[in-house]
Amino acid sequence: MKYFGTDGFRGEANVTLNVEHAYKVGRFLGNYFQKEDHKVRVVIGKDTRLSGYMFETALASGLTASGADVYELHVTTTPSVSYLVRKENFDCGIMISASHNPYFDNGIKVINGKGHKLEPEIEEQIEKYIDGESEEIPMAKREAIGRCFDYTKGRDEYIEYLKDLVKEPFDGFGKWICFYDCKRNL
């Protein structure tokens, strides 16, 4: 594949991955999950890289232009997006992060409705759309246009989920327990 690798679409921000790419990923996904009498719902998270803000906005613009509603977690972790996709029955999730790559890189990782990496066949279709090798996607009109919602409460739900995983106290650790979700730049 041209853009998607082993874990999403990664590249140097505004060099090999730009807002036009992000917008088109959003347009494709918003259309791909459309079904009769179904409002597409997508949850988006990002790490703390500066370019994450522009990619979040571009993805949300593409998704809403295709009729999807966007739930923005803002700064969070990849596991939280995967968890919330499954728990809240989102059509998909998107994590904006390049993981361990340098700070000037970024990436778009699409998570399917089961909380796993998007299937390669769908990533190939996204690439064809980005390169103009597939049919144009119609714009949503009037009340079909999607909306963006602040969904920072989703991060709280994920933290509660992590806390619920620990049923018994850790002997010798005292009353303080710290959960650390290892993530570069977060």
Which residue ranges define each predicted feature?
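N-terminal amphipathic/basic leader segments beginning at the initiator methionine
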Residues: M1-L17
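A generic structural signal for well-ordered alpha-helical segments enriched in polar/charged residues
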Residues: F28-N31, S61, A65, K128, ...
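Generic structural signal for well-ordered, non-membrane alpha-helical segments
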Residues: K2, N18-A22, G26, G52, ...
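Hydrophobic "anchor" residues on beta-strands that sit immediately upstream
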Residues: Y3, R41-V43, I177
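Generic structural signal for well-ordered alpha-helical scaffold segments
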Residues: R27-Q34, S82, I159, K163-K167
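Glycine-rich phosphate/diphosphate-binding loop of Rossmann-like nucleotide-binding domains
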Residues: V19-R27, Y32, G45-M54, D171-L186
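Gly/Ser/Thr-enriched, mixed-charge loops and adjacent short helices
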Residues: E12, I108-L186
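Ferredoxin-reductase
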Residues: G30, D37-K114
